[in-house]
Amino acid sequence: MSAAPHASPTTIACLLGPTASGKTAAALALAARRPIEIVSVDSALVYRDMDIGTAKPSRDERASVPHHLIDIIDPADAYSAASFRADTLRLIGEIAARGRTPLLAGGTMLYYKALTQGLNDLPGADPDVRATLDAEAERDGWPALHARLAQVDPDTAARLAPNDSQRIQRALEVFMLSGQPMSVLLAAPRRTDDAAAAYRFVPVALEPSDRAVLHKRIAQRFDAMLDAGFIDEVERLRRREDLHPDLPSMRCVGYRQAWEFLDGDTDYRTMRDKGIFATRQLCKRQITWLRAMPERIVVDCIAPDSTARALDALERVLDGSTPG
């Protein structure tokens, strides 16, 4: 008796792109054509009470099509790539069971990589270790911890700025918990499982043919956030005793700069300029991640008909008319 043939993997369309590239418009355009549910691939949208600075889809937009992995945790808590992977694989199955089509949409490329390529064997976050490192940074400054990292993990330290508190803390935490440099663990083969083997993830990438145009959009959007009450949003968060600027939520682009302004460390214009610059740097990193995906389908996000082009690409993916 011959073995039963393996079922072909189910194609999952993934709409990826940097900040301000038009992902929401393209996703909603697809929702007008097909019964989809959107799974957010965004590490900032997971937080409740952080709406303006994360450019969260509006209530009307979220009412028009089901969205997932938005407003799922408190800003005092953390959410990992491993949690995203587990939640997304579960949601894909649940959405399909309802007879609907999942669409992954967002710009957190680390999440997408964890989903499609598996996880590294890095230790999880340890609150006690982080508290110790925070106390040392408060006393000695992050550049001193960066110098310590350079002694135990020179490869990781070389690619981090001396004040990149989030990444310096994580790299030292990994070394303290595992006894191995994070660069060594990241270079090891990824831990895979069969959970994602049933799916073929196809990325449609919104990328700018002229980055200056996207940079202008980013500045306009940051100004619109300020006009919409972003500083008031951060002030409400800042009043909470359990929130501080070193939490992952408050390290989100824009929030850190607004917190510094409210602390009196910068003036309004400097805060605005730093927020726009940080967003552009994020955009640059996102595009670098995208360009490392040879399998992606590229749509020019600054073309006048970019939404229609993205919609056409997504429909071709879902109809199976793209190369396997």
Curated annotation (Swiss-Prot):
Example GO molecular function: tRNA dimethylallyltransferase activity
Against SUPFAM superfamilies, the record matches this protein to: P-loop containing nucleoside triphosphate hydrolases
| Positions contributing to substrate binding | T19, A20, S21, G22, K23, T24
Alphabetized UniProt keyword annotations: ATP-binding, Magnesium, Nucleotide-binding, Transferase, tRNA processing
Question: Cross-referenced InterPro entries, in alphabetical order?
Answer: Dimethylallyltransferase (IPR039657), IPT (IPR018022), P-loop_NTPase (IPR027417)
GO BP annotations of the record are:
tRNA modification
**Record protein name field:** tRNA dimethylallyltransferase
